[in-house]
């Protein structure tokens, strides 16, 4: 069984890294739905291995 977790995000560059790091301990795949962020949320999420949907 594989676990996928989806995270909605908007301008969460200050929080997204620690959330993804913690979720990677229990999830096989992390999807971040970026709702038009104007900061580095998407780039940070991608650098940590999350799949980003814009």
Give the positions of each predicted feature.
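Structured catalytic core of nucleotide-sugar glycosyltransferases
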Residues: 1-54
